[in-house]
Amino acid sequence: MSKRFPVDVILQHNIDGTIIPIRLRFTSEEGERQEYTIKGYRDLSGQETRTMPDGVYVIGSDLVYQCKLLVNKEQRMVYLHRKSDGSSWFMTVIK
């Protein structure tokens, strides 16, 4: 299972009910605060109950996004997951 990092997520809530992740912020393992604008995403929410490639078990009502970030001029892919109770978000890095 991939390591989970707690993140703050800025979201756009559209009139049609869709939710778009815009930015994320987290504290690195070195204790440094980092912020990234999401350059692209795929909404993987609302699908069947399953285990994601990062090892996280999700159900159909969970919010899950695969997001593209630009980190030190390199493209990185991450999964964003909202905890089932809706209290917080975490990210896992896709290798």
Where do the PLM segments sit?
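Cysteine-centric segments in proteins
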Residues: 1-95
